[in-house]
Regions:
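A generic structural motif
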Residues: 12-14, 25-27, 74
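Conserved Nudix-box catalytic region and its N-terminal flanking loop in Nudix hydrolases
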Residues: 18-56, 60
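NUDIX/MutT-family hydrolases
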Residues: 86, 94-126
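Short aromatic/basic micro-patch
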Residues: 34, 79, 103
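Conserved N-terminal beta-strand and adjoining loop/helix that marks the start
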Residues: 1-21
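Short, well-ordered beta-strand micro-motif
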Residues: 11, 25, 84-88
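Active-site segment of metal-dependent pyrophosphate-handling enzymes
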Residues: 55, 59-92
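Short helix-loop capping/hinge motifs at secondary-structure junctions, enriched
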Residues: 16-18, 91-94
């Protein structure tokens, strides 16, 4: 995982026994629903970055459960290589960013996210937990 530039999380919580997935509004137009993620800072592990980004973007403290996969894409002429982790909701905290958040059922989350790779990560968790 040494060539990664970003890391993020698929945060799960239970609502009366039903799983919910955390989504945040992207800062850039068209302001899609996305999984929280951000740049890996010097000295951070990808797991630490995922946890920090979930805290900053969504105001959620979550524990890393396991590595899910990697999504590579290009944005503004730069190559982004992002690791994603399954994460378990711990508690709500104060967010560092003013972002809209949404807890969605896995089916809703898959329908709301724009990119197929993101939906694939959410589906993977569903299959693994069934």
């Amino acid at each position: 995982m040494e060539d990664l530039t970003h890391a993020g999380g698929v945060v799960l919580r239970s609502d009366r026994g039903d799983p919910q997935v955390l989504l945040v509004r992207a800062r850039r137009p068209p302001h899609d629903w996305v999984l929280p993620k951000g740049r890996i800072e010097a000295g951070e592990t990808p797991e630490q970055t995922a946890r920090r980004e979930v805290q900053e973007e969504a105001g959620v403290d979550a524990e890393v459960v396991r590595y899910l996969g990697r999504i590579d894409f290009e944005r503004d002429g730069r190559e982004i290589r992002a690791a994603y982790f399954e994460m378990r909701f711990v508690q709500e905290i104060e967010a560092a960013e003013d972002r809209e958040i949404r807890w969605a059922t896995p089916g809703e989350a898959i329908a709301l996210v724009r990119f197929e790779d993101t939906g694939r990560l959410i589906r993977q968790i569903l299959v693994d937990h069934s």
